[in-house]
């Protein structure tokens, strides 16, 4: 029996099929550039603007973000103040920052004393795997 000889067309198709996965991987690992590039200066500026001269405390604010999200266009984020809220000291504002997003200030939430609680659930669009930060400012000037 005669063995079929590979044609030029089948060799080119096989070569393209072998080269394609490497190209896709290289594109996936390429750093974001242009308008999608991370903006560390804007991140630092947003942090400094919110904190001011206060020293942030390590406790009192709970941030719940999944380690891996199914959909980067809608990552669920929950933020909650765990300190007791009173009429003299309540949470005025919470911000959520996505460190490697082109616009790092992802969410700004403002509360009044009448809210009774300071918690929220939002969905963020994240440009890539990154650290998400949250800061809260209390009426007394404390930053969490």
Q: Which residue ranges define each predicted feature?
A:
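N-terminal secretory signal peptides and thylakoid transit peptides that target proteins
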Residues: 1-19
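Short edge beta-strand/loop segments characteristic of extracellular beta-sandwich folds
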Residues: 76-84
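Beta-strand signatures of extracellular beta-sandwich domains
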Residues: 93-97
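Exposed aromatic-hydrophobic patches
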Residues: 119-124
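Extracellular Ig-like/FN3 beta-sandwich strand-entry sites
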Residues: 127-131
């Amino acid at each position: 029996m005669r063995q079929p000889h590979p044609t030029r067309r089948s060799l080119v198709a096989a070569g393209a099929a072998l080269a394609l996965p490497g190209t896709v991987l290289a594109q996936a690992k390429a750093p974001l550039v242009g308008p999608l590039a991370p903006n560390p200066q804007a991140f630092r500026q947003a942090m400094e603007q919110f904190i001011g001269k206060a020293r942030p405390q390590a406790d009192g604010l709970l941030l719940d973000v999944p380690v891996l999200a199914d959909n980067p266009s809608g990552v669920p984020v929950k933020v909650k103040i765990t300190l007791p809220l009173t009429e003299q000291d309540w949470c005025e504002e919470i911000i959520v920052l996505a460190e490697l997003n082109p616009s790092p200030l992802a969410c700004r939430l403002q509360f009044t004393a009448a809210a009774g609680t300071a918690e929220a659930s939002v969905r963020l669009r994240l440009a890539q795997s990154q650290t998400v930060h949250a800061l809260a400012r209390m009426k007394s000037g404390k930053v969490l």
